Curated annotation (Swiss-Prot):
Residues 30-74, 113-253 are annotated as: Disordered. PANTHER family: SMARCE1 REGULATOR OF CHROMATIN, SWI_SNF-RELATED MATRIX-ASSOCIATED ACTIN-DEPENDENT REGULATOR OF CHROMATIN SUBFAMILY E MEMBER 1. Residues 21-335 are extracellular. This is Uncharacterized transmembrane protein DDB_G0281039. The chain crosses the membrane at residues 336-356. Residues 1-20 form the signal peptide. Residues 357-375 are cytoplasmic. GO terms for cellular component: membrane; SWI/SNF complex. GO terms for biological process: negative regulation of DNA-templated transcription. Keywords: Membrane, Signal, Transmembrane, Transmembrane helix.
Length: 375
């Protein structure tokens, strides 16, 4: 917006200068006009020859000046070309070195990366981390609503295409490939077994989830991580096997289009608290489903905490996101913008006045000439 206004201002200034130079009325004295007419009718040959000689000298001098000016410009261009070539070579070297450095970092950060099951073919083969949200921040879900990470080397997780809740993340944040396809007890038990097999601590993931849910309000360290809950006092969970998590922008998952996540900007921030096999019990998350339809696996125990959604205990909760979605699009009018608008409007008015004056002046001259010709 500011750039456009600035460009418009520059155009107005140039137009004003051009109009001033081209349309300034030449108020010549009548005696000078007569002299000019006499000079036109009586040409002087000697004077004309002298003028030609002066013009020839003037034409010869700028050629020398142009040659002198062109030499340093050519040198500067050569230097710039050399610098560009050097920069391109450095960029090529950096691009070659980057993948090697990334591999080394991943191996140091995730020692157990070889044991992780690869993702299904509907994801990218390069195992690039996927991102949700307007500013491309990775989102994370954890066993009790805490942020978790997907895969040791950035493998994206996926959701089953038949609108089933996703599950199968173990305590280290590794993605399991056999997500729930049909909601029944056998599939949920299989997911739990896979979680237990891939868990380095050999803990029961289902029990850890329920214990973590119970400890949300008691601030007791969970048995899986021995850390206090990450959502108390907004302290993020730090685990030796996973990088430090951070909050994510509001997002939602579309479970119709092949289970791929799709962004809906007006959905408020949320997180998941899986219960009994890592399923999500939330009528607000899956619109059009009743909790009894969505959650048909092993029922949660009576001691487990209810999902924390849309309330003050959730640090990602913000009323503005879903009560006032128009606030996100609102643009503030800065004093600089007001100044630009004022300047532009004054320039437009000045241009109109100048054009009007010039037209009036031309009409007056035309009227005078016609009167003189009639007389």
């Amino acid at each position: 917006m500011k750039n456009k206004l600035f460009i418009i201002l520059i155009i107005f200034i140039i137009l004003k200068i051009v109009i001033c130079q081209n349309t300034t009325p030449s108020k010549l004295i009548p005696q000078q006009q007569q002299k000019q007419k006499q000079q036109q009718t009586q040409p002087h040959h000697h004077h004309h020859h002298h003028q030609q000689h002066q013009q020839h000298q003037q034409q010869h001098q700028p050629n020398q000046q142009i040659k002198q000016q062109q030499q340093p410009q050519q040198q500067q261009l050569q230097q710039q070309q050399k610098q560009l070539e050097q920069q391109q070579q450095q960029q090529k070297i950096q691009q070659q070195q980057q993948p090697q450095q990334q591999l080394l970092q991943q191996q140091q950060h995730f020692p157990n990366s070889q044991n992780v099951i690869k993702t299904p073919p509907h994801h990218t083969q390069q195992r690039v981390p996927h991102h949700h949200g307007p500013n491309g921040a990775p989102h994370h879900h954890g066993p009790n609503g805490a942020p978790h990470h997907h895969g040791p080397n950035g493998a994206p997780h996926y959701h089953s295409p038949n609108a089933a809740p996703h599950s199968g993340h173990n305590t280290q944040g590794h993605v399991q490939t056999n997500h729930v396809n049909n909601i029944n007890k056998n599939n949920i038990n299989n997911n739990n077994n896979n979680n237990n097999n891939n868990n380095n601590n050999n803990n029961n993931n289902n029990n850890n989830n329920i214990n973590d849910n119970k400890n949300i309000r008691n601030n007791i360290p969970s048995p899986a991580t021995k850390d206090p809950n990450p959502f108390i006092n907004n302290k993020p969970k730090v685990n030796s096997n996973t990088p430090q998590p951070f909050p994510h922008p509001p997002h939602n998952h579309n479970l119709v289009n092949g289970g791929r996540p799709v962004i809906h900007k007006q959905i408020p921030p949320h997180h998941h608290i899986p219960m009994g096999g890592g399923n999500i019990q939330s009528n607000q998350h899956f619109q059009g489903f009743q909790p009894s339809q969505v959650f048909t696996g092993s029922q949660p125990s009576s001691n487990s905490a209810s999902p924390i959604l849309f309330n003050s205990e959730n640090p990602f909760y913000k009323e503005e996101y879903y009560k006032h979605p128009e606030k996100q699009v609102e643009r503030k009018i800065t004093p600089i913008m007001v100044l630009y608008i004022l300047l532009a409007s004054t320039m437009v008015i000045q241009l109109f006045i100048m054009v009007f004056k010039q037209v009036k002046h031309i009409r007056e001259i035309n009227a005078k000439t016609t009167m003189e010709s009639l007389l």
